[in-house]
């Protein structure tokens, strides 16, 4: 009488029939003599070590969680506790339906024989759920591919926060010694996306913490990077974003106005210091008089210059409200102000 098949953590025989399992403990001989796909002996190995004669490529095993260690180069540093609790509940009810991916550690003296390549969150949840063994695909992965594979899994699962993703990109650039274009081609992302994400690492540390915690979005962070006043101003605006609930669009407008005001003040400051001699614009009789009349009309500084082929009028304003006031004056009929071409 055939013995009933043993339940394999929610996976049954489906996955084991597709992925080689390698020789079981106590078996000898080359891998070509091991159990074949679909045979009655092609079962999973419960916590058995990987022999030196394992089948090349990926093999399927069920491994005790204690025999596995986390990936030290895991790009994701923040694990959502609520989502992890939901996964624990699901594993207790249905088992772990998707295996993790690990690589074998040769010569380990601590009892840990495998290292996670993909699936640290599932491994953590399986431990908390109390599983004796968890399904795993043992794959040969070199050190140079360990970070890349972990990064790609997290990107595809949308589990990295912007700062973790940026740090992982920078680490890949440093370790591979490649350009942004080459990295983009390797991991299937666009070069502008990689460049913009890495720029987030230039933010002040307190602002980075807000982004990592999800309090500020990547859009907010990119807007803050455009603030020219420096780190202190970026931290101050970040606090204001959180306190007032500013949208990304509102943040961008605030940064634009702040930069304009800083440039205006710098312009006035430069006006008090002697500037190097430069070519003077062509002057015509009455041109300065027109500039003064416009300045009086708009109650702001106005400069009028004339080049060889065309002239230019510059009307300065101090704020958005000031601009609206000036535009309102411009829409009125200027003939009563005596601004005729004959005045030139």
UniProtKB/Swiss-Prot annotation:
Under the heading SUPFAM superfamilies, the entry gives: KorB DNA-binding domain-like, ParB/Sulfiredoxin
- Region entry Disordered: which residue ranges? 1-33, 259-283
What are the protein's GO molecular function terms?
DNA binding
Report any one BP term from Gene Ontology: chromosome segregation
Could you list this entry's UniProt keywords, alphabetically sorted.
Answer: Chromosome partition, DNA-binding
Residue ranges with Basic residues bias: 1-10
Q: Origin, by domain of life?
A: Bacteria
Q: Which InterPro entries match?
A: Chromosome_partition/occlusion, HTH_ParB/Spo0J, ParB/RepB/Spo0J, ParB/Sulfiredoxin_dom, ParB/Sulfiredoxin_sf, ParB_dimer_C
- Gene3D superfamilies reported for this sequence: 1.10.10.2830, 3.90.1530.30
Q: In the UniProt entry for this protein, what further remark is given in the free-text comments? A: Was identified as a high-confidence drug target.
General function of this protein: Involved in chromosome partition. Localize to both poles of the predivisional cell following completion of DNA replication. Binds to the DNA origin of replication.
Q: Give the UniProt family note.
A: Belongs to the ParB family.
What name does the UniProt record give this protein? Answer: Probable chromosome-partitioning protein ParB
């Amino acid at each position: 009488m055939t013995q009933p098949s043993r339940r394999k953590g929610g996976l049954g025989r489906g996955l084991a029939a597709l992925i080689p399992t390698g020789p079981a403990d106590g078996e000898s001989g080359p891998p070509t003599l091991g159990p074949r796909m679909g045979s009655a002996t092609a079962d999973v190995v419960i916590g058995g070590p990987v022999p030196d004669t394992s089948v090349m490529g990926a093999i399927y095993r069920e491994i005790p969680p204690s025999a596995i260690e986390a990936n030290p180069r895991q790009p994701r540093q923040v694990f959502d506790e609520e989502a992890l609790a939901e996964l624990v509940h699901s594993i207790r009810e249905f088992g772990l339906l998707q295996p993790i991916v690990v690589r074998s550690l040769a010569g380990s003296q601590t009892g840990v024989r495998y290292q996670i390549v993909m699936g640290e969150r599932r491994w953590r949840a399986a431990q908390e759920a109390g599983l004796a063994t968890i399904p795993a695909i043992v794959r040969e992965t070199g050190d140079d591919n360990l970070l890349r594979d972990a990064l790609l899994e997290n990107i595809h699962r949308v589990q990295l926060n912007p700062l973790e993703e940026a740090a992982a990109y920078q680490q890949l650039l440093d370790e591979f010694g490649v350009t942004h274009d080459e990295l983009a081609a390797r991991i299937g992302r666009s070069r502008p996306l990689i460049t913009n994400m890495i720029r987030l690492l230039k933010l002040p540390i307190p602002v980075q913490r807000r982004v990592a915690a999800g309090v500020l979005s990547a859009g907010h962070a990119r807007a803050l990077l455009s603030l020219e006043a420096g780190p202190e101003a970026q931290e101050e605006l970040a606090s204001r974003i959180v306190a007032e609930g500013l949208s990304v669009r509102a943040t961008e407008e605030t940064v634009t106005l702040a930069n304009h005001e800083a440039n205006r003040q710098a312009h006035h400051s430069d006006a008090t210091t002697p500037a190097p001699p430069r070519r003077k614009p062509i002057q015509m009789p009455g041109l300065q008089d027109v500039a003064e009349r416009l300045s009086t009309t708009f109650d702001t500084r106005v400069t009028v210059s004339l080049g060889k082929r065309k002239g230019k009028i510059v009307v300065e304003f101090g704020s958005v409200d000031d601009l609206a006031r000036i535009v309102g004056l411009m829409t009125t009929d200027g003939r009563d102000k005596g601004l005729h071409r004959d005045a030139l």
